Amino acid sequence: MKSVRYLIGLFAFIACYYLLPISTRLLWQPDETRYAEISREMLASGDWIVPHLLGLRYFEKPIAGYWINSIGQWLFGANNFDVRAGVIFAPLLTAALVTWFTLRLWRDKRLALLATVIYLSLFIVYAIGTYAVLDPFIAFWLVAGMCSFWLAMQAQTWKGKSAGFLLLGITCGMGVMTKGFLALAVPVLSVLPWVATQKRWKDLFIYGWLAVISCVLTVLPWGLAIVQREPDFWHYFFWVEHIQRFALDDAQHRAPFWYYVPVIIAGSLPWLGLLPGALYTGWKNRKHSATVYLLSWTIMPLLFFSVAKGKLPTYILSCFAPLAMLLAHYALLAAKNNPLALRINGWINIAFGVTGIIATFVVSPWGPMNTPVWQTFESYKVFCAWSIFSLWAFFGWYTLTNVEKTWSFAALCPLGLALLVGFSIPDRVMEGKHPQFFVEMTQESLQPSRYILTDSVGVAAGLAWSLQRDDIIMYRQTGELKYGLNYPDAKGRFVSGDEFANWLNQHRQEGIITLVLSVDRDEDINSLAIPPADAIDRQERLVLIQYRPK
């Protein structure tokens, strides 16, 4: 009966965190609107080989992540939950692997369940795992690859070892097809310390070629198909998206070496108090083969991405699967022997919740700020934000009431965040970051437009997805569409600021022309260098400017 209660509790936990609240959150630009529109266009065009965004070639990522997102939209339809359905599926599958791997290592069902709950409740896992980007997919393939490698190395027969390495190659191949060649580098770096300390080079050299073969065979069909359709895809994807993005001086998202330290700290909430002890205990038990494997799996990718010039929090998502296992193992040890770390964890969660409550008041309409984040008419959003942090502090306090038994309720600290964050976003943020909000406000004006132009790729993708049309024209800025706009068949999909007046004169008689611009809050739209408009509708950071036929 206890096992049944645990399972019911786990399913309720998943429903409250990963299923029920997702549709209440509008899509964020530029990431979620971009991936939603790419998958919508894939379904609409039937082209499952070449990724397109706004009808233009889009070579920033390979195809597999778009396949999964497209299947989600195909199965469930076009709404906010369905855009995120594939992404949500990825951390849940990863959590299943965490359960399986923990059972393999320690043969303890309670520990396996705890590791799963810790993984799914980690702040970084939840934040990225419910956000429609490709990183949860690549994290799943990386975790699956590490599980496959362990399975292969623990097998006692040549058949078992061969099957494990073949499976490793398939997961690496799917990782390459999801986000590129980092899916090859990260697993290799992660296992090398373990292979060296355990002196398992022989198995690696004997069976490793099977992983290479299965990886190549996994990528080959689509790899050849994309070369036949778009011969320059691999050149662009390798040199621009890999070398330039991570290694060169002009790499995207440049950040210092220590960038991931605060990411690890924030990402480990609501289990931050256990982090030092988990890592220290793991290091102290480094003679244990499984512990070395988990430590190497956690630390090596972290060091690799710290050395790289380009950094984003999403890059280290796969590190948190082994970290969750280490945290769970240490938590049970602490509960038995020394609950001090569990008490510290409770106080950290209380402090985080109280700090959030105070910060919410400071930026609320009743706080000291001259320009509050929320306006007076958004009082209910302020109370939602207060509720988020109040619940966080409450469950932090509850874990201290009988710490040896209640410490695991820290998993419920983010419950308010999961249920209420969609209702607490300030209008001033929604108006700039949620194109759906803008579309809802201006639907009657946008719908009959013959041409729609905008100066933001994220807004363009949001307009395209909401209006179910891919002919949005870029105005003045090309952004990440620069490469796709260079193709001869993309002529007419970009209008510069200097050309706009002439372009308007040439196309005005064809129908309503709508210009959607991103502006600063204090910017005077009358000073914009554009022809006089027939209608202007300003929604804070986004402005709709319309020209009717004359």
From Swiss-Prot:
Q: Where is the signal peptide?
A: none
Entry membrane topology: Multi-pass membrane protein
Q: What class of enzyme is it?
A: transferase
Catalytic activity annotation: 4-amino-4-deoxy-alpha-L-arabinopyranosyl di-trans,octa-cis-undecaprenyl phosphate + lipid IVA = lipid IIA + di-trans,octa-cis-undecaprenyl phosphate
Its transmembrane ranges are 7-27, 86-106, 111-133, 137-154, 165-185, 204-224, 255-275, 288-308, 315-335, 346-366, 382-402, 406-426
| Pathway this chain belongs to | Lipopolysaccharide metabolism; 4-amino-4-deoxy-beta-L-arabinose-lipid A biosynthesis
Q: Name one GO cellular component term.
A: plasma membrane
EC code(s) of this entry = 2.4.2.43
Provide the GO MF annotations for this entry: 4-amino-4-deoxy-L-arabinose transferase activity; mannosyltransferase activity
UniProt keyword annotations, A-Z: Cell inner membrane, Cell membrane, Glycosyltransferase, Lipid A biosynthesis, Lipid biosynthesis, Lipid metabolism, Lipopolysaccharide biosynthesis, Membrane, Transferase, Transmembrane, Transmembrane helix
Give compartment(s): Cell inner membrane
What biological process terms from GO does the record include? Answer: lipid A biosynthetic process; lipopolysaccharide biosynthetic process; protein O-linked glycosylation; response to iron(III) ion
Main role? Catalyzes the transfer of the L-Ara4N moiety of the glycolipid undecaprenyl phosphate-alpha-L-Ara4N to lipid A. The modified arabinose is attached to lipid A and is required for resistance to polymyxin and cationic antimicrobial peptides.
Name this polypeptide is given: Undecaprenyl phosphate-alpha-4-amino-4-deoxy-L-arabinose arabinosyl transferase
Q: Tell me which species this is from.
A: Shigella dysenteriae serotype 1 (strain Sd197)
